[in-house]
Amino acid sequence: MSGSKKKKITKADRLKQILEEEEKRQKEEEEARVKYEKEEMERLEIQRIENEKLQKLEAKDLERRNEELEELYLLEACFPEAEKLKRDNRFLSQWKHYIECDGSPDPSIAQEINTFITLWKEETNETLEEVIEKSKLVLNLIEKLKLILLETPPYDLQGKNIIQYQESILELQELLHLKFNRATEILLRQASTLADLDSGNMEKVIQDENVTLYIWANLKKNPRHRSIRFSETQTGFEIPRILATSDIALRLLHTHYDHVTPLSPVLTPSQEHISIVTDFVKEEVKSVQTAVSKDLQEENKQENESNSVHEEETKAEGQGDVEEQMCPVQEEPEATKYEMEMKLLSETVSAAQELLLENASEKPYFLEENEVDLCQFTTLGGVYHLDILELPPQCKPMKGWMIVEILKEGLQKYTYPPETTEDLEAENVFPPIEVTLEVHENVIFFENPMVARWDAEGKQWKTDGISNVSYKSEERLITFNLETFCPVTLIQDAHINMPYQSWELRPLDVNKVLLTITTVFTELQIQIKENLCMLASIKVNNKNHSSILEEKWMTPVSFIIALKKAGLNIFPTGHSHLYVVINYKHPSVEVKAYRQMALLSSAFAFCWSKWNTACESKKTVFQVREHLLKEEPIRNPNWTLLMFSGDRAQSLKINESSDAFSEALKEETEFHSTLYHMVKDFASQEAMRAVRRSNCQFVDSVCHMLLSTRLLSYS
């Protein structure tokens, strides 16, 4: 055999190799174990140091908690002060109305409003122009009553007053519509004298800031005259042959307000809320009585000592000394009484604010088929009252007089289609009527509007009986077929701008801020100063959009109503969470956050954070930075990320660009019980002075707008 032979490994060599590998493995395992234990010890040591540090910070926070809360309580005295000012203003406006004696009633006084209604009912033969002029006062009275119900805190509204105001509103609404019907009848009696020379029919259009009235009287009954267009408008009808040959009149009364939809229920506190406030009142009264009693006893003791030492002088001084000694006794109870009033008012305001954020557990009522859910949708642009009327007997000239037959039953509606018909093809004989309406110019629709009709029997808006709806957004025209004439309205999803994409609150001037809210369709900029709000600008689909609301200062409640009427609803209700995916935050946490953000808003800017959705419902996360008025706008400002639970505020280690959420405390920062003391750690003295000098009405208005928009839950 040739060539080298491969060396054969012996059993001893194999055993030696196995032992070496085992020793190496054990050595590596030991090194890994030692390394792991070392790292674990280091980690535990770091964790221990961190825990000790956190415990010290928590202990420090707990130690100064009472002091911080007391300071916050003093700052939050602006809320009861603002409420007291609002109460005083309500009384003052009533007094001013009383001394002006302008002839208009005070709608809050039942006797005055009832007298006004009775006297107006007695007025007859009013023309449409006269009714429209009178309607301005009536609408003003209705708005005043609605504002009383919305602006008065729930705890100040008695049940009987709510019923009284709502009944007055309904009676005024019904009477106003009745007056329009009577005035329409008077006009239609003269239709033959007002006939158009070309068509031979009567046509009249009356436009006003609150109503637009279109009336067409079919005098010629020409079967070929089936297309009706009112002059200088695109509003009109396509009527079937049977109507074109009938003694009828068509009326379109477009009220720019909605007096058809049932009144919204007034927000009232639950029994639980009432008991909380009642218990607080009892405790405060008891403590005040104890304090007053103690003060009086101390005063009497001092008085007795003074009398025993200076008995002779007292006798000589007589009554003068008695008056001097009584002064401090009278002053103390007055001061204590005021203090009790403000404490009670503070508790009432807090409870009312939490009531604003309560979420309903379910929808308020069961929906029928085709019924419009008024919790989900809202009517916009007013109501179009569509009526087919029987043409009343016409005026006839006779020997220099105008003779007219007046029907006892008044203005009668023409039934179309007839309630009973033997024709099997009734749809062909009585086809739907095509209606073309002009959409109110001051209303914004972000999607094509839906059309709803009023079901008088069921007292609800319904979507059946309407077909072939088409909308021309550029021309603001909507056309549809209607089976029978009745009031119709345009509806839009009330939550189309919810949830919000982002928001920012920043100072503009002394006691003036700008609130910017960005949604899928629009960006709204709202200015707030003192007790007023204003729409500063609006963008729709990233383009500037003009609105009649711009540059108009209004009280917060009036401003919210105006925005809703314009289709700019950014104000959730207690049922909104049933229709919108929200980032739920506990009401008590939200209220505390909004109150303290409002307190700081004169010197600090706040904005949304994407991490607010990552934390639990009892914690909120947002960004904050100092913003003094003299500063130039910063392109990329440095924001501090804060987490607030209502009881504790802390600065977070992460920022908006971090990969994951963490509640880790930012280095070299501490825990605090309030946002005020949290920002105080990094704020300038000038900023804190600006906060302390804030106007109470301004702070209250900012807080009201934050509570109404619910930025932390709906963004």
Swiss-Prot record:
Transmembrane segments: none annotated. Ubiquitinated. Ubiquitination leads to its degradation through the 26S proteasome. Ubiquitin-proteasome-mediated DNAI7 degradation occurs in mitosis. It comes from the Eukaryota. Residues 295-318 have a biased composition (Basic and acidic residues). It is found in: Cell projection, Cilium; Cytoplasm. Residues 291-322 are annotated as: Disordered. GO terms for cellular component: axonemal dynein complex; axoneme; cilium. GO terms for molecular function: beta-tubulin binding; microtubule binding. The keyword Ubl conjugation applies. Keywords: Cell projection, Cytoplasm, Ubl conjugation. Via its association with the multisubunit axonemal dynein complex, is potentially involved in the regulation of cilia function. May act as a cell cycle regulator. Belongs to the DNAI7 family. Part of the multisubunit axonemal dynein complex formed at least of two heavy chains and a number of intermediate and light chains. Associates with tubulin. Interacts with microtubule. This is Dynein axonemal intermediate chain 7. The lineage of its organism: Eukaryota, Metazoa, Chordata, Craniata, Vertebrata. The gene is DNAI7.
